Amino acid sequence: MELDNSHLVLGLGATGLSVVRYLCRQGITPLVMDSRDQPPGAEQLALEFPEVNLITGGFDCRYLVQASQIVISPGIAIDTPEIRAAIDMDIEVIGDVELFARAIKDRSPCVIGITGSNGKSTVTTLVGEMAKAAGLNYAVGGNIGIPVLDLLQKPVDLYILELSSFQLETTHSLNCISATCLNISEDHMDRYSDLEAYRQAKLALYDQSKRALFNREDSLTQPNDPMNQNSFGLTSPVNDEWGVKDGKIVHGTTEIASLQDVAIVGSHNHANLIAAMALAYHAGIDKEPMIQVAKNFTGLAHRCELVANIAAVAYVNDSKATNVGATVAALEGLGEHLGDIILIVGGDGKGADFTPLETVFNKVAHLITLGKDGDKIAALKEHSHKADSMADAVKQAAELATAGDIVLLSPACASLDMYKNFMARGDDFRQLAQALSVETLDSEASADV
């Protein structure tokens, strides 16, 4: 193979495939490299683009140093030695979102950008539902669902994008109508040097937006520099802010909806809803579609999702809580619950500091830990229970719970030490919880014979 490839795609998977599709539509045949021996998407690449070469098992520097542009997948750290060497040689290193931004650069602002440690998918979906209710021609994607470059294959008027810190590291020219950073808490500390480095990766989105929407109850989300900005929160708003007053969601002095009519549960989700309303407002969506969605949207799978109710015990799947902040938010959101909370927590902590959990463990009657970093979390609360598996954790929780209690899976950790992803973890919890009802019915049937 001749060493003449000017465009490299590093990392295959769904994002890498979308980059290849886009470049090939532009008449560019890239070279693809992946550090894995058998990367996901390899068969699809060969089927769709037999002319595109794939090198696996590492990044060959001979190709990197001759490239004019390298497009990296979000999972590849920009400080990977081979990538850093290319950057030091002034070779352009970008991501798929930056390619997307350049593709739409001649259009009027048509993007809503959403980042934050937690709640991104919920807010992105909510804004999408509001756009749908308003009859807009829209598309939702990015870190949720469809890769951004695949969204370009159909003409739309509004793009609603969930954006991770990894994606924002390589994005510089996204021209948003409005953008938000919902919250900041420790996450991906195995990739970032400290919380501030992670925060700055998130806040880079504000510099690429006409308006910044920050969380006034989380000072870490405030823009670094003065700009066209507004805020949201659960407190009473001032001037043009979004918030809550007398049990009602309000924009300034304008009432939008009563919290009593909102379908989604938990104070953290009410904050997510308010953020979505503010973003939708700046996209020209009026009050009625917001109200319609607020009354009907009950939440996403694996996010404080009620999966079973057995013997008056609620089993709630919050497997998407892959960091400490998400679990803190879940426990605070359920803070008004009258029964006990039995919490199942643990997994791969990604180098995070677990001590903030101590502040909310007073809301937890029984703590059950599992996974790689379960013991570190167990040390934060006396008389915790250790589980060897999810099945063991659910069994222990069922034995501890009484009528009116909640069994909450909110791990505060990634799932990769035990599962393929957080969805698989949540599905396992759901199946185990729902199986309890089958066992109960079987035992009752036997007793009646």
Swiss-Prot record:
Protein name: UDP-N-acetylmuramoylalanine--D-glutamate ligase
Gene this protein is translated from: murD
Entry-linked HAMAP family: MurD
Alphabetically ordered keywords of this record: ATP-binding, Cell cycle, Cell division, Cell shape, Cell wall biogenesis/degradation, Cytoplasm, Ligase, Nucleotide-binding, Peptidoglycan synthesis
Catalytic activity, reaction form: UDP-N-acetyl-alpha-D-muramoyl-L-alanine + D-glutamate + ATP = UDP-N-acetyl-alpha-D-muramoyl-L-alanyl-D-glutamate + ADP + phosphate + H(+)
GO CC field: cytoplasm
Enzyme Commission number, as recorded: 6.3.2.9
Keyword Protein biosynthesis: no
UniProt organism field: Shewanella violacea (strain JCM 10179 / CIP 106290 / LMG 19151 / DSS12)
Superkingdom, natural source: Bacteria
Cysteine disulfide partners in this protein: none
Cited function: Cell wall formation. Catalyzes the addition of glutamate to the nucleotide precursor UDP-N-acetylmuramoyl-L-alanine (UMA).
